[in-house]
Amino acid sequence: MNIISVGVNHKTAPIEIRERLSLSEVQAKEFLTNLIDDGIAQEAMVVSTCNRTELYVVPGMPEVDGNYMKEFLISYKDAQGEVRPEHFFNRFYCNTARHLFEVSSAVDSLILGEGQILGQVKNAYRIAVEVQSAGILLTRLCHTAFSVAKKVKTKTKIMEGAVSVSYAAVELAQKIFSNLSIKKILLVGAGETGELAAKHMFQKNARNIVITNRTLSKAEALAEELGTNQVLPYESYKDHLHEFDIIITAVSSKEYVLTEPELQQSMQKRRLKPVIILDLGLPRNVDPEIGNLKNMFLKDIDALKHIIDKNLEMRKCELPKVKKIIDEELVGFAQWINTLKVRPTIVDLQSKFLEIKEKELERFRYKVSDAELKRMERLTDRILKKILHHPIKMLKAPVDTADTIPSRVNLVRNIFDLEEQNRLSK
């Protein structure tokens, strides 16, 4: 029994190729159904995100390998001539398990430690379950991957520290003010960056968030989504600067949207109560001279980038710990697979000796009393258990290579004259 993984990701293919092979949920369900119905796969799962489309397959036919699955996916997406085999990676057996463990643990992500991928893998497994393409092997593989990801998250710092500008800004504000729930926050700009910053603030329990934007309806839409319903007209928001403890700017502007005189006047009204200004604009939205004002803490993208770099370096230092967790779980998963592979032989071995026992006891059925026969049954059961203990233990023992398993199986089948000696390899 083997499991292969094949696909494209940010390491193997450019974005246009990844986009070309991306599968929607509807397509993924159809693709998996085709694999199972056509007998190509016994089990199958597809993980498809913006950065990867990866297939995890238990082959249903001898000719199904990585190259077969590459061509099948290319054909399904009608991408012949656009996508080449060298755009794909290919894994099999335990390397497939290792790859999924690394993906689920976010160490194979475009951004190291990016935790969103685990939810995407869980969604891929859900789809496989719904179309009944997840059997015993994929189910065990996925649940082990989920367990690995949980251990990595709780026992390492691989997912800690902001690695995006908007999140770094929020973390910095929390470090300075500690409790964001009691602070009043102004967001200038409701575009993608501003929206992310506002949502990160909300996740940190900030609730008093006021939004302003050149297009008022966009500010209102974001405020409604957050549940704050607090907006200011763009033309008049500067009249209220003194009311805010944190100001986040994220607008597209060639000129500064906040100048030193404006903030100096605001600070006088605040009686010099501290203010954090987080300038997420590019070009900068805030006059850098503002940073010289007393109790005014100004951080721009460069300052936040420094925080991000430190966090990424910290995450890289956690990689050996993650690798150790993955290695330990991989050993357990490999041993479980080996047990699956030898199970038919163990069943045959037990069945053969049980049959011998029944035949021999049958000879005494009418020669001894029922009580004596039961004692003989208990005695023979104990003898069989001791006889079979060593060969079964040997079959289940850990192996260094996959080739060891067939040789063990064949040895046992030959010694005990079991039928279908090549059952495992078939």
From Swiss-Prot:
PANTHER family: GLUTAMYL-TRNA REDUCTASE
GO biological process: chlorophyll biosynthetic process; protoporphyrinogen IX biosynthetic process from glutamate
Binding site for NADP(+): G189, A190, G191, E192, T193, G194
Function summary: Catalyzes the NADPH-dependent reduction of glutamyl-tRNA(Glu) to glutamate 1-semialdehyde (GSA).
Catalytic activity of the protein: (S)-4-amino-5-oxopentanoate + tRNA(Glu) + NADP(+) = L-glutamyl-tRNA(Glu) + NADPH + H(+)
Keywords: Chlorophyll biosynthesis, NADP, Oxidoreductase, Porphyrin biosynthesis
Location of the active site: C50
Family stated for the protein in its record: Belongs to the glutamyl-tRNA reductase family.
Enzyme nomenclature, EC number: 1.2.1.70
Coiled coil regions in record: none
InterPro entries assigned to the protein according to its UniProt record, in alphabetical order: 4pyrrol_synth_GluRdtase (IPR000343), 4pyrrol_synth_GluRdtase_dimer (IPR015896), 4pyrrol_synth_GluRdtase_N (IPR015895), GluRdtase_CS (IPR018214), GluRdtase_dimer_dom_sf (IPR036453), GluRdtase_N_sf (IPR036343), NAD(P)-bd_dom_sf (IPR036291), Shikm_DH/Glu-tRNA_Rdtase (IPR006151)
GO molecular function: glutamyl-tRNA reductase activity; NADP binding
Signal sequence range: none
Keyword presence, NADP: yes
Site location (Important for activity): H99
Miscellaneous comment: During catalysis, the active site Cys acts as a nucleophile attacking the alpha-carbonyl group of tRNA-bound glutamate with the formation of a thioester intermediate between enzyme and glutamate, and the concomitant release of tRNA(Glu). The thioester intermediate is finally reduced by direct hydride transfer from NADPH, to form the product GSA.
Enzyme class: oxidoreductase
Keyword Transcription: no
Domain text: Possesses an unusual extended V-shaped dimeric structure with each monomer consisting of three distinct domains arranged along a curved 'spinal' alpha-helix. The N-terminal catalytic domain specifically recognizes the glutamate moiety of the substrate. The second domain is the NADPH-binding domain, and the third C-terminal domain is responsible for dimerization.
A Pfam family this chain is assigned to: GlutR_N
Binding residues annotated for substrate, in chain numbering: T49, C50, N51, R52, S109, E114, G115, Q116, Q120
Protein name per UniProt: Glutamyl-tRNA reductase
Subunit record text: Homodimer.
Pathway involvement of the protein, from the record: Porphyrin-containing compound metabolism; protoporphyrin-IX biosynthesis; 5-aminolevulinate from L-glutamyl-tRNA(Glu): step 1/2; Porphyrin-containing compound metabolism; chlorophyll biosynthesis
